[in-house]
Amino acid sequence: MNCAIMQPTFLPWAGYFNLMSQVDHFILLDDVQLEKQSWQTRNLLLLNGDARWVSLPVKHDNLSQSIRDTEFLDTSRWSAKLMRSFQQNYGKHIHYAAARDILDLLEFQPEDTLSTFNEQVIRETAKRLGIRAHIHRAGDLRISGKRSARLISICQYFDAEEYLSPVGSADYLSEDSFAEKTTISLKFQKYKPLLYPQKGSQEFVSHLSIVDVVANLGWDGARQYILKGVIDE
């Protein structure tokens, strides 16, 4: 049994779903603090031939608010602008309809918060990619603790024998002496995004949102692309 623990980010890139595809349990840290100009609220799409940020319109009420409590500003104009831009830049892609499936998920409900909104998009995208990991909210588990101590407690909750982490977390896990604090095996994701035929760019642009992958490859192609990026030991 293994697990991975990540924040529910906005329109994640392919590597996010690669991580999810390798675990039994995927836990969304839905109660972390809101960070300005972070992956929580923005991601990259290919617009006018360049990687451009697309950001969610959220309310910044106080410095300590969690993404679980973060509400949205008026979204009607934002949604209309995004759809126009998407149509202009991806409308002629062979798999436009497949990518539009993701954009159609960006329908805001009055009760939505940043975490529940991102979670819904992540869950539905993972389903379309054929990913079978069980997805959970960390906030529902009522497990306290800081940094790696909380990660260990979450892994123990699911009787996980292995924790799979993105390589970007290696430094802080080392600083926290994660491996010395538990018998849970610590493994790092080995994923290298491959090139794919990318319409609209003169040179390949990596690490864009999964939307770009699906627009160029379709759902079946995106599924294969995500799995092929794993680097063998």
Located regions from the model:
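Residues lining hydrophobic/aromatic ligand-binding pockets adjacent to catalytic sites
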Residues: M1-E233
